[in-house]
Amino acid sequence: KITGSANISTDVNTHTYLSLSDNSTWDIKADSTVSNLTVDNSTVYISRADGRDVEPTRLTITENYVGNNGVLHLRTELGDDNSATDKVVINGNTSGTTRVKVTNAGGSGAYTLNGIEIISVEGESNGEFIKDSRIFAGAYEYSLTRGNTEATNKNWYLTNFLATSGGETNSGGSSAPTVAPTPVLRLEAGSYVANLAAANTLFVMRLNDRAGEMR
């Protein structure tokens, strides 16, 4: 158990029960494994490399994870579903609430179909993982969401589309066509389009404007 604003750093696998509390920090330097992990008002850095490119680090929890206002920091090359990313793999159950902070590792943004999987859960997935701050790259704004199918709803993904319900079934029993999800663009994208439109029309004048006011 690590308490009292302690800081630990590991670069080898660790097979143990680890409990962080009282603003403690665990700085992971390489792929690591623990049996159980509790993050209580503390922070875990899955990786904190200085370079722009991500070298994915994996934290494996062979049993259970508990979050109590904990924070997980991950680095992801924000792009499409196949983007390189740090990852947390939990073979057991999750509980509590954890904030997740994602740092972009040089990604330029791309549309995601299913999302970038950053947290995988095998057991009961009762824990909630909440985006700590904005996550964006290129024109896209990313959210942290559960998977939207029965096979993936225990896991957590970085997505940049609006969630839609499945195809509706009509009275004849057939399903309506599936509507493609709508991409979520950065707030700044709207301002860019508006500024571009204004720039393109700024010096477009009517004849009366060019001739001046008639006296």
Feature map (PLM): residue ranges:
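Extracellular beta-solenoid/beta-roll
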Residues: 1-93, 97, 103-104, 108-160
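Flexible, glycine-rich linker and terminal segments associated
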Residues: 33, 108, 155-157, 161-184
